[in-house]
Amino acid sequence: MAKTTKVKGNKKKSDTSKVVSKVSRKRSHEDSESEVEDNEKVVEELDADFDEVAGLLGDDIEDPESKSQSKKEKQKAKDEAKLEQLTKPQVSNEVPDNDNDDDSSEDVLFENADFSEPTMKAIKEMGFTKMTKVQAKTIPPLLAGRDVLGAAKTGSGKTLAFLIPAIELLYSLKIKPRNGTAVIIITPTRELALQIFGVARELMQFHSQTCGIVIGGADRRQEATKLAKGVNLLVATPGRLLDHLKNTQFVFSNLKALVIDEADRILEIGFEDEMKQIIKVLPNENRQSMLFSATQTTKVEDLARISLRPGPLYINVVPEKDVSTADGLEQGYVVCDSDKRFLLLFSFLKRNVKKKIIVFLSSCNSVKFYSELLNYIDLPVLDLHGKQKQQKRTNTFFEFCNAKQGILVCTDVAARGLDIPAVDWIVQFDPPDDPRDYIHRVGRTARGTQGKGKSLMFLTPSELGFLRYLKAAKVPLNEYEFPANKIANIQSQLTKLIKTNYLLNQSAKDGYRAYLQAYASHGLKTVYQIDKLDLKKVSASFGLDQVPRVNLSIGGTKTKKQKRS
C-alpha cells in the first residue's frame, strides 16, 4: 500500500515559479531588483488581504431557488435535438437485456466466489470483501465465457469486473510467457491505462502469468522488448497498441480475450479508425470480448457489433429511475461575473487547503497559467494536462492519488475512469461542454457504495441555460450564493503581479486565448455564446489589465474533442 502524504509544495514553489523568479532576476540590476521587491510585496499583500476576510466561504452559503434565463430562438431547435441525444438511452434492440431490476447481488461476498487460489489470495490482500452490483452481475457470465456489453455509472467497480475473469482465463488455460499475449485491455487515456495496470499487477501477484502496459509517451523500445519476451495480459491505449501490432514482432495469435473500457470516450477523442484497424488485425476465433461504456451511443453500438460475438449479454446497472450521479454526492453551482471568477476560486481554495480538491479547466494553457499563478502566491497545487510529457503526467497522477490533501488543477484528461481516492471537492471552474462531461467530472468524487463528496460549478449569468440540460439529464443541483464581502478583494494586487512579471504575463495571455478558443468550440451554442462574454472581465480573471487580441476559429475545423487530452 502506498504511504499517504500531503501534496508537495508547502515549503517551496513549483518549478515554474523558480523559472519565473530566475528569468526576472536576469534583467538589468535596477529593473530586476525592483521587480523582485514588487513581486514579494504583491504576494505579501495577497496574503494580508486574504487574512482580513473573516469567515470566508464558511457556513454562510445560502441555498435560494435557482435562477432562469431566456435563450436565443435561432439555435433552439438544434440544441433541443442535442439535448435529446445526450439524455436519451440509445441501446440497440439486438442486444438482449438481462433483467437488471434484481437487487439480489447486493450481498455477494468475494469469499464465496469460485476463483482460483492465487486470485482469492490477492483479493483478500487488497482488502476487497463485498462485490459491487456491476461485479456481481458481470463476473459470472464472463467466467462462463459470454461476451458482455456493460453499462455502469462511473465509480461502480467495473475494473475488477473485467480483470478478475480475464486473469482467471489466463490461469485456467495455463498460459505461459512464451505463449504471448492472451488478453488485451484497451483504454482511452494513459492515466487510466496506468491505473488498470496497477490493479492488474496486484491481482496477478500470486500468479505465474505476466502483465504489461503500452501507452503513448512511454519508451517504445522498452515496450517492444517486453512484448517480445512475452506479456500475457496487456493494457494499452489505442494508438500505441496499433503501432506495436503493425511494427513490433510479438506473439498475439493466442489472443483469448479483448476488453474495451470506456468505449464511448475512446470514440469521442477520435480513435474510431484506430479501433477498427485493431479489431481487424486481432484474431477473433474463440475470442471472448467485453465492452464497457458509461453511455450507449450509435458509435458504441457499431463498435460492439464488430468486436463482440453475436448475441452478447447486455448488463446495465443504472436503473432508469435513478439520478445520473452518485447518491453520496452533494452538487451545487455559483453564479458570478467573469471578473470575479478567480477571486472566488482563490477564496474557496484558500479556505479548503486541508481538503483534497480537483479543479477542472477547459484548456491546457489555462491549467498551466492558473497552476503557475497559485504556486507563485504560495497556494500549492499540482497540474495535469495533455501537453505534459508522459513521465510528468504519471508522477503527478500518483502523487495526488497518494496525498491526503491537496489541489489538482487539470483538463478533462482526469475526468474519465480514474480512481483517485478520497476526493472531497470537484470544482468545475470552466463549464463542461454537455451533461455527460459534467457527470464524468463529478464522478471523480463520491466513488464506491459508501462514497461521499461535493461539487461546485462556476457559471456566468449568460450560462444559466445549461441548468436545463442538467435537469433533463437527472442531475440534482442547488445554487450556492457567496456574499461579496466574503470574497477576497485581491484584484489590484493580482493585476500588479501579472503586469510586472514577464513570464506570468505571457502565460496569462496564452491562458486567456486558450479559454476563448475552448469557449468558442462549445457544442451548446445557445448556452455558451462567445459574443455574450465581456472580454474585459474575462481578461481580468487572468490578471490582465489589457484585453489581448485573439483569432477565434468559430465554425472552422478546430474542435474541442482532440486525441491529446
From Swiss-Prot:
Residues 26-85 form a coiled coil. One of its GO terms (biological process) is maturation of SSU-rRNA from tricistronic rRNA transcript (SSU-rRNA, 5.8S rRNA, LSU-rRNA). InterPro entries: DDX18/Has1_DEADc, DEAD/DEAH_box_helicase_dom, Helicase_ATP-bd, Helicase_C-like, P-loop_NTPase, RNA-helicase_DEAD-box_CS, RNA_helicase_DEAD_Q_motif, SPB4-like_CTE. The Q motif is unique to and characteristic of the DEAD box family of RNA helicases and controls ATP binding and hydrolysis. ATP-dependent RNA helicase involved in 40S ribosomal subunit biogenesis. Required for the processing and cleavage of 35S pre-rRNA at sites A0, A1, and A2, leading to mature 18S rRNA. Its main location: nucleus. The keyword ATP-binding applies. Its EC number is 3.6.4.13. A motif (DEAD box) lies at residues 261-264. GO terms for cellular component: nuclear envelope; nucleolus; preribosome, large subunit precursor; small-subunit processome. SUPFAM superfamilies: P-loop containing nucleoside triphosphate hydrolases. Residues 1-106 are annotated as: Disordered. It catalyses: ATP + H2O = ADP + phosphate + H(+). It is found in: Nucleus, Nucleolus. Associates in the nucleolus with the 60S and pre-60S ribosomal subunits. The keyword Oxidoreductase does not apply. Keywords: ATP-binding, Coiled coil, Helicase, Hydrolase, Nucleotide-binding, Nucleus, Ribosome biogenesis, RNA-binding, rRNA processing. Residues 96-106 have a biased composition (Acidic residues). This is ATP-dependent RNA helicase HAS1.
